[in-house]
Amino acid sequence: MVNVGINGFGRIGRIVFRNALLNPKIQVVAINDPFINLEYMVYMFKYDSVHGRFKGTVEAKDGKLWIQGKPVIVYGEKNPSDIKWGAAGRDYVVESTGVFTTVEKAEGHLKGGAKKVIISAPSADAPMFVMGCNLDQYDPKYTVISNASCTTNCLAPLTKVIHDKYGIIEGLMSTIHATTATQKTVDGPSNKDWRGGRAVVNNIIPSSTGAAKAVGKVIPSLNGKLTGLSFRVPTIDVSVIDLVVRLEKPASYEDIKKTVKEASEGAYKGIIEYTEEQVVSADFIGHHASSIFDAQAGIQLNPNFVKLIVWYDNEWGYSARVCDLLVFAAEQDAKQQ
């Protein structure tokens, strides 16, 4: 059992907690959020506009958050170094504020007693890991690691499967991405990203993303071969990647479908899923996989040039991988003790 603390009880913090409750190897024992009081935590965890009402019990009692009859200590510190993670053996911390995303900033949790920090976002300097792609590079000596982004978690497994089988010369990615918390409901100021300041409810908004380039950090043989952009769209959850790649080895689309299907049933089971159904985005709300390959949606120009389509629940699927990485890190760390 891994005792876990969560810093930041926003979208990902809460969905990580919901996923953790489904994982018998994880016990969330503490939450820190300076902007949410205990009573409001109960409300926010109980009701969710995307994933529905929490089906278990949640209440505030004795200054703690009680979920499924188990107590969760609540802190309200702004500085990670002030959070007393070590007081009750909370060895692992999920850093989900979106603020402390560098090693230096995330290391503040170590001063409070945490032994390891998993950042639920891309990081400029922390080692990034994607389930199914580069766990062989994990070193228990790392004190801060990153689970990369939701889009990288979707893209990397698929590109690895294709690259290992056929070789990728180069590729371009577009992610048609659901709304996130940083966007605005009406036009407002956004000095660094003017288009990002436009209303999300009635616009398709082009945006930058580092997700494709980040694949090169996770899979070094693809470094410099992929880049991409994002379109923010007015849907509340589930995103889809449109990946166009030029292949070294010629392959029919049927060959590619077979390769991905075999991967989804083998080494990538639970990470990649395969569907030939006539699906749309809402069909994947609450889906646990990192990548859902849409076999009916892809197209091919010639044996070396193909467009592949993969869906992902950018909240639920990503949070499931945060939990998986937590368990993996804890198990590897235990072997070194």
Swiss-Prot record:
Coiled coil: none annotated. Pathway: Carbohydrate degradation; glycolysis; pyruvate from D-glyceraldehyde 3-phosphate: step 1/5. Its EC number is 1.2.1.12. InterPro entries: GlycerAld/Erythrose_P_DH, GlycerAld_3-P_DH_AS, GlycerAld_3-P_DH_cat, GlycerAld_3-P_DH_NAD(P)-bd, Glyceraldehyde-3-P_DH_1, NAD(P)-bd_dom_sf. One of its GO terms (biological process) is glycolytic process. This is Glyceraldehyde-3-phosphate dehydrogenase. The record marks 177 as: Activates thiol group during catalysis. It catalyses: D-glyceraldehyde 3-phosphate + phosphate + NAD(+) = (2R)-3-phospho-glyceroyl phosphate + NADH + H(+). It is found in: Cytoplasm. It comes from the Eukaryota. The lineage of its organism: Eukaryota, Fungi, Dikarya, Basidiomycota, Agaricomycotina. PROSITE patterns: GAPDH. It comes from Lyophyllum shimeji. Belongs to the glyceraldehyde-3-phosphate dehydrogenase family. The keyword Cytoplasm applies. The keyword Oxidoreductase applies. Pfam families: Gp_dh_C (PF02800), Gp_dh_N (PF00044).
